């Protein structure tokens, strides 16, 4: 497959360490970042982290803060209104997946740089040049701005709720399926397949898989492993120029459930369930994936997430329609209701 131009979008600098939030002014100086800043953050815990960031900004820095708690197009518009008022040099996204997604999409739409400062290791959007924004045509990722820099403070990340940490593990292990789906599409449809980016995504998944052995014993070391895996996954997407290395049938299932059951479930939790199911379809050892996730307290049954059997089965039957241009193990026609029910029961997602 001949491609005239392939653009790789990567962060310029990645800072990972303990208590590094106190060195933000040094990092900004190294990168030539100057105020005014527009800080995008959440409304609760993440706002407290944002306050600590503000305390450590360069002396006399000018800044404005906007708080959001969802990742909708309306939230993006709210940020853009403040952008017009403040005319910032750069955006700082301080929060979880929703905050960082809104920040990077607003940065993309307004031709601005942004710095990613995650407060939970729940998503690989920390690094990637893609965002998931509700209110667009479909519940899939759209092109956004890659971060100029990432500042990942292990002390902060390891204090995030365990449910969010587990969701990050579920999201990252899913790359095992994404890469297999990508390889399948290359073989059957002649789709472009990047060996290097696929290997990087797969390495991220294996790293997260190893994390399941450590996280219960040493939370900080486990979170460091996880954040490195999440960052690598985001880099793989930036190198591929698409979400292909990190999003396959397991993500299609997650997006389908989100359409049917839009509230109360974390994206990474749904990806984890989808990974178990799609591992079965790919003929790989789904039991070991399920067992590893279960040992860290990950919800491996639909009912643990408040999902009905019907929602799971329905999601499996419509998953292939979420991104029909993206070929996966689900094929063009998807699964019948009876097949979907059988697979969900065999993998113990439903009883």
Swiss-Prot record:
Substrate binds at residues 124, 171, 255. Homodimer. It is an enzyme of class 1 (oxidoreductase). HAMAP family: G1P_dehydrogenase_A. Zn(2+) binds at residues 171, 251, 267. GO terms for molecular function: glycerol-1-phosphate dehydrogenase (NAD+) activity; glycerol-1-phosphate dehydrogenase (NADP+) activity; metal ion binding. Keywords: Cytoplasm, Lipid biosynthesis, Lipid metabolism, Metal-binding, NAD, NADP, Oxidoreductase, Phospholipid biosynthesis, Phospholipid metabolism, Zinc. It comes from Saccharolobus islandicus (strain Y.G.57.14 / Yellowstone #1) (Sulfolobus islandicus). It holds the Pfam family Fe-ADH_2. Its EC number is 1.1.1.261. This is Glycerol-1-phosphate dehydrogenase [NAD(P)+]. Binds 1 zinc ion per subunit. The keyword Oxidoreductase applies. Catalyzes the NAD(P)H-dependent reduction of dihydroxyacetonephosphate (DHAP or glycerone phosphate) to glycerol 1-phosphate (G1P). The G1P thus generated is used as the glycerophosphate backbone of phospholipids in the cellular membranes of Archaea. NAD(+) binds at residues 97-101, 119-122, 128. GO terms for biological process: glycerophospholipid metabolic process; phospholipid biosynthetic process.
């Amino acid at each position: 497959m001949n491609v005239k131009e392939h653009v790789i979008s990567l962060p310029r600098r990645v800072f990972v360490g303990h208590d590094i939030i106190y060195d933000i002014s040094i990092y900004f100086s190294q990168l030539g970042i100057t105020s005014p800043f527009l800080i995008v953050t959440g409304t609760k815990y993440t706002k407290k982290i944002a306050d600590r960031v503000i305390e450590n900004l360069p002396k006399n820095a000018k800044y404005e803060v906007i708080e959001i708690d969802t990742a909708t197009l309306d939230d993006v518009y709210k940020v853009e209104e403040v952008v017009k008022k403040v005319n910032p040099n750069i955006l700082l996204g301080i929060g979880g997946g929703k905050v960082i997604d809104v920040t990077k999409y607003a940065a993309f739409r307004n031709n601005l740089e942004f710095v990613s400062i995650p407060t939970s290791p729940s998503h690989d959007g920390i690094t990637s040049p893609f965002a998931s924004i509700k209110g667009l045509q479909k519940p899939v990722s759209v092109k956004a701005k890659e971060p100029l820099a990432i500042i990942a403070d292990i002390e902060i990340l390891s204090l995030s709720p365990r449910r969010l940490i587990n969701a990050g593990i579920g999201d990252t292990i899913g790359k095992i399926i994404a890469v297999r789906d990508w390889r399948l599409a290359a073989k059957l449809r002649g789709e472009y397949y990047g060996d290097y980016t696929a290997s990087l995504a797969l390495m991220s998944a294996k790293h997260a898989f190893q994390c399941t052995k450590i996280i219960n014993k040493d939370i900080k070391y486990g979170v460091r492993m996880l954040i490195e895996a999440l960052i690598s996954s985001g880099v793989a997407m930036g190198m591929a120029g698409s979400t292909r290395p990190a999003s396959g049938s397991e993500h299609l299932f997650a997006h389908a459930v989100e359409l049917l059951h839009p509230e109360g479930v974390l994206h990474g939790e749904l990806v984890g369930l989808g990974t178990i199911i799609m591992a079965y379809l790919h003929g790989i050892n789904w039991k070991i994936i399920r067992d590893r996730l279960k040992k860290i307290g990950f919800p491996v049954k639909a009912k643990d997430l408040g999902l009905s059997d019907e929602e799971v089965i329905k999601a499996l039957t419509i998953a292939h329609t979420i991104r029909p241009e993206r070929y996966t193990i689900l094929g063009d026609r998807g699964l019948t209701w009876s097949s979907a029910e059988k697979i969900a029961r065999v993998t113990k997602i439903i009883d």
